């Protein structure tokens, strides 16, 4: 599966091209809003989402039949943005399931600003490696 092309069609809200990536019985979970979609529901939710979108794929990790992506998504006017971490489970090079975690970008809460905590690249790598290990059943 070409995950770069998949994200391109997600952002372009191209229903016909998106459908080609999925197994017939695939499903998608949006955990932050407790939503569970079959393929048709997911494509409808994505393609009918208001606005015009763009973004960039910031990171991709692969392990067996699993692909993990971190993407930055925003409207074309860049008035706000989101980050999404997606776990793709594949079967015969098609998407069997996606588990996604969407979060709106913003400022740190006031109580934490004085801590001046920044997410370093090393910490981001460690977090993604731990997530990949958990998904692959590897003990760290």
Regions flagged by a language model, labelled:
Residues 1-140:
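C-terminal and inter-domain tail/linker signature
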